[in-house]
């Protein structure tokens, strides 16, 4: 019996080891590429990878059943016409311990629209016709970015489009697939809802004497109704594709979108849906740029504390709501505060902490009411003291995080 048990344990271990050889990390198996020239197909420098694949491949972000798995998703840089192919060196035998390989191709087909290429020749034929691709919608803004190596500058355009633009619906179906790889909680929107607005970033470049355009990124904005006669545009999705990140395109896009809506008297303010920390930093930078020269945000006014005039002027001039205006004030006040001066530093720190402590105070009041019903008075007081101690630590930690974020905004502002 002992020999049999030993055999079964060893057999199970051997099987698990064998199966592990057929597990692939989908974050590295999926290879993305934006193709401008035929030689880009073989250029590994052009390849980039997803940050997330859990929506298709589960929380462990793995595909089972393959060795050397490669999931190729190559896009023509402008039109995003797609080459999709699955490659691997070996596949698990269907009879191997009653297991089957994951349907990798089926999972990818869930998010990419039909009409993609499966062989290179068809893809290259479409690439030859790329000169016919032009940006959709209305041109809102043109800007340039200098080359990181110096000398050359690159030209970019931001357009506003909608579903009435010829070919845009199909283009958007291809574009939105990138969301699944780079936004953790991404989902596709209802494009038949006319309240969606689309803002697109393109690079303008030359190829063999012709002018072409490459997709850089995009933003979707939903226009909510605000009683009785206003709207509140809310940023829903924003993505700058990996090869273009770190070049300032996010700030250009967000600033352009804000300036677009500022021109409409019916717009109350501009918000964002579940903003990430990186988005908040970007918005901080853009809104501070807007407000830094407003009279209500002068050095003298900033040192006096946040005022209703600041909130009103930020809303009237730039459609910034009171909560965001308060954050702008905190950044600009840090800019004019001498942090080496003990009194100025103390005044600034207390001002920020007064805002941060408000939700804690409410929580404390609610907790005290509940504990009076459930605990003796002495125990309640003791637990409240512990709670307060923890709150002070959390407040200080949060304050330091904010100051660090604010300093980065100020440093970036100084580089403008």
From Swiss-Prot:
GO molecular function: histone binding; histone H4K12 acetyltransferase activity
Reactions catalysed, as given in the entry: L-lysyl-[protein] + acetyl-CoA = N(6)-acetyl-L-lysyl-[protein] + CoA + H(+)
UniProt-annotated site: Interaction with histone H4 N-terminus, residues: 196
Record region (Interaction with histone H4 N-terminus): 59-61, 222-224
Gene knockout outcome: Homozygous deletion of HAT1 results in neonatal lethality but survival to at least late embryogenesis. The structure of the vertebrae in the neonates degenerates near the base of the spinal column.
InterPro entries listed in its UniProt record: Acyl_CoA_acyltransferase (IPR016181), HAT1_C (IPR048776), Hat1_N (IPR019467), Hat1_N_sf (IPR037113), Hist_AcTrfase_B-typ_cat-su (IPR017380), Hist_AcTrfase_HAT1_C (IPR013523)
Phosphoprotein found in the keyword field: yes
Keyword terms, alphabetized: Acetylation, Acyltransferase, Mitochondrion, Nucleus, Phosphoprotein, Transferase
Subcellular location: Nucleus matrix; Mitochondrion
Enzyme class of the recorded protein, top EC level: transferase
Residues found modified as N-acetylalanine: 2
GO cellular component: chromosome, telomeric region; mitochondrion; nuclear matrix
Positions where N6-acetyllysine occurs in the chain: 6, 12
Subunit and partners: Catalytic subunit of the type B histone acetyltransferase (HAT) complex, composed of RBBP7 and HAT1. Interacts with histones H4 and H2A. The interaction is dependent of the ability of RBBP7 to bind to the N-terminus of histones. Component of the histone H3.1 and H3.3 complexes.
Function: Histone acetyltransferase that plays a role in different biological processes including cell cycle progression, glucose metabolism, histone production or DNA damage repair. Coordinates histone production and acetylation via H4 promoter binding. Acetylates histone H4 at 'Lys-5' (H4K5ac) and 'Lys-12' (H4K12ac) and, to a lesser extent, histone H2A at 'Lys-5' (H2AK5ac). Drives H4 production by chromatin binding to support chromatin replication and acetylation. Since transcription of H4 genes is tightly coupled to S-phase, plays an important role in S-phase entry and progression.
PANTHER family (UniProt xref): HISTONE ACETYLTRANSFERASE TYPE B CATALYTIC SUBUNIT (PTHR12046)
Protein name in UniProt: Histone acetyltransferase type B catalytic subunit
Source organism of the structure: Mus musculus
Gene that encodes it: Hat1
